[in-house]
A protein has these predicted regions:
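Alpha-helical transmembrane segments within multi-pass membrane transporters and channels
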Residues: 60-104, 111
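Helix-loop-helix "hairpin" substructures at the membrane interface of multi-pass membrane proteins
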Residues: 16, 138-216, 220
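Short, non-helical or kinked segments that cap or interrupt transmembrane helices
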Residues: 29-49, 63, 91-96, 166-169, ...
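Alpha-helical transmembrane segments of polytopic integral membrane proteins
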Residues: 24-33, 52, 77-78, 82-83, ...
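Membrane-interfacial amphipathic/re-entrant helices at transmembrane-helix boundaries
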Residues: 1-23, 51, 61-66, 92-99, ...
């Protein structure tokens, strides 16, 4: 195989792997904090892509305005998700909460179809550069954006959990809820913040992958499945 094709495949693999890593990270965060598997994580990737397409096309706002607004909006969605799907069932067994997240997944998918239609949509790219051409190597600039953004987020997350008080409180909650509560850590608040954080990670994944493919109500299903596989391989 030509070495130029190998390089192009490398960038493609790194970019898509970065997307699945963000999804997997969100799944793992909720699992460790709340002891549940969030089967709606894929739909939390799909929803912000639809919202961004609507704002970019209908409101004609630039991407640097739309993306932060969508991330904040999805943070609110994450909080509502925790209050509705998890909090009332927090003292129940594992199964009802799992079914609740599946219900949220179905609700979000059908809501997206009702609000934005059944046909796939095209998300405008954040840059005007179509392709990077270096000799015989052709690279989609969106791949570079995905890889760089994911790397920055992973470094920022490491700093957040290791250097900030809130991050350490979230870690303590994930490791031992009873001990964290005895130390005065508000574990209910930490779990809610974890849901918000996880949803915002899914949002970033949706905004990054949206320009590469058509935005449809089905896009979250496969992405969520691959992210779930990544979480299993990486270890919950």
């Amino acid at each position: 195989m030509d070495w130029t094709i190998n390089i192009q495949l490398l960038f493609t693999g790194l970019a898509m792997g970065s997307i699945y890593a963000l999804i997997a990270l969100g799944i793992v965060l909720i699992y460790r904090a709340a002891d549940i598997v969030n089967f709606a994580q894929g739909e939390l990737v799909m929803l912000p892509a639809f919202v961004a397409v609507f704002m970019l096309n209908s409101w004609e706002l630039p991407a640097y305005v739309v993306y932060p607004l969508v991330i904040v909006f999805m943070g609110g969605v994450g909080y509502v998700f925790e209050r509705v799907a998890y909090y009332p069932l927090r003292n129940r067994s594992f199964l009802p909460v799992i079914i609740s997240t599946i219900g949220v997944s179905i609700f979000l998918k059908n809501s997206a179809q009702y609000a934005f239609g059944a046909l796939p949509l095209v998300m405008p790219r954040p840059t005007d550069v179509d392709l990077f051409v270096i000799g015989d190597i052709v690279i989609d600039p969106q791949y570079i954006i995905i890889i760089v953004t994911t790397a920055i987020l992973l470094v920022a997350q490491h700093f957040f959990f290791e250097r900030t008080m809130l991050g350490k409180m979230m870690q303590a909650t994930a490791q031992d809820k009873e001990a964290a509560q005895l130390m005065g850590i508000p574990i209910a608040r930490m779990i809610a913040i974890t849901f918000i954080f996880s949803t915002m990670l899914a949002c970033v994944a949706g905004l990054l992958v949206g320009p590469l493919f058509y935005v449809s109500k089905e896009m979250g299903g496969m992405a969520g499945l691959k992210g779930f596989c990544g979480a299993i391989i990486g270890g919950f």
